[in-house]
Amino acid sequence: MKRIVLLRLGHRPERDKRITTHVGLTARMLGAEGMLLASDDSGIVQSLEDVVRRWGGNFYIKNNVSFKQEIRNWKEGGGKVCHLSMYGVNLPDLADELKKCDKLMIVVGAEKVPPEIYQLADWNVAVGSQPHSEVAAVAITMDRIAEGEPLEKEFPGAELTIVPAERGKHVIENAGE
C-alpha cells in the first residue's frame, strides 16, 4: 500500500489558518495518511482532528515539527520527497515516477520556502508554471498519482457519511457506530 504524508512549511497562524486547513483536508481526502505542520498551531490540529472524528479515517496531524528532521527521518526510512512549487520539472513529466513510489512525502509551502528544500527534495515539481494555490497543487498532484482512486474511498469509523445523490444532501448520521 502506498504511503503518502504531507509536510506543510511556512504556515503563518495569523494568516494561513483556512488555507492550511484546506491543504490538510485535501490531502486526507485524496489518500494521505497524515500531515506534518512545521509551525505551531494547535487550532489547525484541533480542526483537522475534529474532521477525522466526524468523517472517519485514520489521518494524523503532527504539530510544530522540524522540517529538516522529518525529511531526514523519512528518507532514512526509505521514503522519497516531492516538493511542489511553480519551479521544477513539470508534473506530467514526473507523474509516472511518482506513482511508482511506495513512500512519498509531499512538501508544500505557504510563504517562501527555505532554499535548502530544493536540495533536500528528491523532486522539485512544477504544478503549472504560474502562481497558484497550495490546495490546487496538492489536489492535482495527488489525483495524478492515484488516478482518481481515492475519490471512491470509504473512511472507516465515520460518524457522518454522505450518500451520493443527483439532487439534495443525503447524510447518514452515526454510520461509524
Swiss-Prot record:
- Where primarily located? cytoplasm
Q: Which GO terms describe its molecular function?
A: tRNA (cytidine(56)-2'-O)-methyltransferase activity
Which EC class, in a word? transferase
An annotated GO cellular component of this protein is: cytoplasm
- One Pfam family named in its UniProt record: Trm56
Q: Which family is annotated? A: Belongs to the aTrm56 family.
What EC number(s) does its UniProt record assign? 2.1.1.206
UniProt protein name: tRNA (cytidine(56)-2'-O)-methyltransferase
Give the multimer and partner information. Answer: Homodimer.
Q: Which CDD domains does UniProt cross-reference here?
A: aTrm56-like
Q: Which residues bind S-adenosyl-L-methionine?
A: L84, G109, A110, E111, K112, V113
State its role. Answer: Specifically catalyzes the AdoMet-dependent 2'-O-ribose methylation of cytidine at position 56 in tRNAs.
- What does it catalyze? cytidine(56) in tRNA + S-adenosyl-L-methionine = 2'-O-methylcytidine(56) in tRNA + S-adenosyl-L-homocysteine + H(+)
Q: Where on the tree of life does the source sit, at the highest rank?
A: Archaea
Taxonomy of origin reads: Archaea, Methanobacteriati, Methanobacteriota, Stenosarchaea group, Methanomicrobia
Its BP terms in the Gene Ontology are: tRNA nucleoside ribose methylation
Name its cellular compartments: Cytoplasm
Gene3D superfamilies in the cross-refs: 3.40.1280.10
Q: Which NCBIfam families match?
A: PRK03958.1
